[in-house]
Amino acid sequence: RNNITPKIHFAITIVVFIVISTFTTKLSAQEPVVQWDQTIGTTSNDNLVQVNLTSDGGFILGGYTSGGISGDKTEANMGGTDMWVVKLDALGNIQWQNSIGTSSSDNLVDIVQTVDGGFLLGCTSSTGISGDKTEAAIGLSDFWIIKLNASGVIMWQNTIGGTGNDNLTDIEPVPSGGFLLS
């Protein structure tokens, strides 16, 4: 009798486990529903670096491309690769876009939304004044920080660095409303 009781208890435990597992699997196995999908690009090499939710429920896409006017891109290439920023609404429709660059390669590193609804973006630049860049190079490479308004228009820009290599890796908002650059 002692040998039967543990076996029955074990069998009941297994049955209960299977029932719970089956019920849980059915609840969690529901396929997610695709709300929308969107392919955005040029006929050249496009690199997406960031996708962020915006305060209006849309999305900001940031990356870089060697493509000129083609596909979805409406602005010419300035040289090498240019930063490419695309604002989407909540349904994935393009609201605006901006291609920002110099005569050399400009690969977007980060983009964050600002409290006024605009955007702060940046890259590492080794180029002087050319294309959209209005400030001279300081060192071998510098932070190039650009402020866009909520419509994607450049409001201001700043070149930051020393005499050597300064490579931007991150833009982080801080509670005071400013930003940390690293």
Predicted feature locations:
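Bacterial Sec-dependent N-terminal signal peptides
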Residues: 1-32
